[in-house]
Amino acid sequence: LIACSCRTTPWLTAWEESQRMALEADPTFRECASLKGGEAGLKCARSIALISYRSYEGYNLTQAEADVDCMFADRAGSYQRYQGKKLADRFDAYSYYYLAKSVDSNNIGRGRGGCEAALATIKARTIVIGIDSDRLFPVCEQKFLADHIPGAEYKEITSRFGHDGFLLENDQLKEVIEPLMN
């Protein structure tokens, strides 16, 4: 398990709701006239999501202005706009809205006596991997999983890239996961 939790936290719900609010603020989203509706809201929602996936250090590393004397910093802003457009070109706002809504429903303990009881039933060999800079699923969430899954091991990787570290820290993840394959 990596960069996840057994149930949605209030922190995660707040991020998801902020994205839905951006979608709902777009008048074309509310009109429901076409799948292109809500495109401006989708771009904004994506920008909000990106900030939640990344970290302060990661943005400073990748989005700092090349010109230290620039009057108006825009590299990070341009990146946010680019990522919003990129998503809007391949995804529709209505699907994004319900995908964000579905995240709020995550709770493996529902109907199973709570998360601790549900986790206690896991019999598979389990390694839980936390990312030290992940703000969406902080390491305390990963440690909770490892503490309640019988025989689970906890490993932590270091990343400057927040939650997206699970996509970017390939060497560290390989070091943790590869031994499981043998």
What spans do the regions from the language model cover?
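Short, conserved loop/helix-junction motifs that constitute active-site signature segments
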Residues: 119-123, 148-149
